[in-house]
């Protein structure tokens, strides 16, 4: 069974619960940011908001089906996985295609291929979402952002009011998540540092030369992926040299 490195330690149940709560907050904020906040102004329909709730419901159904197939109990690990899958989906992604991708995700997971585990199944999942989005010409704008022009400032970006996936825009919550996970022995903190280092360097250059922060970088799902995918994958680089090469290489790409 595929597990992330963070969840290998059975003595970290309390930390798992904290992480689960933060992931839930990211999800709830994403639903608010992409739908609920516009309801009072009649900019979205209730059916549009209901659709946002269907993403985590579909991913939890996938977890349930996988657990029944493997005859395993549903754990906090499974709940976290289901929420992460929902957080990474663009807010207007077609539900039918999303359901097919979730089915494929857990089908691949059931085979337990070592090559897939080494790459990280969640990485494959996100790449497929990006590829499908490109094919059907879908971006990360929600329904209101698609029809109105918005300019998001620095504070908007930090507190999540920016363009992004369903639940990956709130940098404040993501930083809290990072601090929580850094207390785990298995969490690869150095890898996160080298994944984010080029971004911080680029921001310093922007401030020194252009006298402003590059808010486009703050809108990226990259922050969320940098702390939750590679650092938690047990098969990702472990040695100092490998971590530096992998972290800087991926971030530059």
Residue ranges and their predicted role:
Residues 72-81, 97-100, 116-127, 189-198, ...:
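Cytoplasmic-side transmembrane-helix entry/capping segments in multi-pass membrane proteins
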Residues 113-178:
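Long hydrophobic alpha-helical segments that form multi-pass transmembrane helix bundles
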Residues 51-67, 82-83, 101-110:
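Central hydrophobic cores of alpha-helical transmembrane segments in multi-pass inner-membrane proteins
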Residues 24, 79-91, 122-137, 197-207, ...:
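Small-residue-rich segments of transmembrane alpha-helices in multi-pass membrane proteins
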């Amino acid at each position: 069974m595929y597990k992330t490195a963070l969840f290998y330690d059975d003595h970290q149940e309390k930390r798992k619960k904290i992480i689960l709560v933060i992931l839930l907050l990211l999800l709830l904020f994403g639903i608010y940011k992409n739908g609920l906040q516009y309801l009072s102004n009649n900019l979205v329909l209730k059916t549009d908001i209901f659709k946002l709730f269907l993403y985590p419901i579909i991913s939890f159904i996938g977890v349930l089906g996988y657990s029944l197939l493997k005859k395993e109990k549903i754990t906090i690990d499974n709940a976290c996985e289901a929420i992460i899958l929902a957080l990474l989906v663009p807010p207007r992604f077609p539900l039918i295609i999303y359901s097919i991708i979730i089915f494929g995700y857990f089908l691949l997971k059931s085979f337990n291929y070592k090559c897939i585990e080494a790459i990280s199944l969640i990485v494959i999942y996100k790449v497929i979402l990006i590829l499908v989005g490109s094919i059907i010409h879908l971006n990360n704008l929600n329904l209101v952002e698609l029809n109105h022009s918005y300019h998001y400032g620095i504070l908007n970006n930090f507190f999540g009011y920016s363009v992004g996936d369903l639940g990956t825009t709130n940098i404040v919550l993501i930083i809290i998540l990072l601090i929580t996970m850094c207390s785990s022995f298995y969490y690869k903190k150095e890898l996160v540092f080298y994944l984010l280092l080029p971004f911080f360097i680029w921001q310093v250059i922007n401030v020194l030369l252009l006298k402003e922060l590059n808010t486009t970088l703050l809108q990226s799902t990259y922050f969320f992926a940098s702390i939750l995918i590679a650092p938690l994958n047990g098969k990702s680089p472990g040695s100092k040299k490998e971590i530096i090469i992998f972290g800087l290489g991926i971030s530059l790409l």
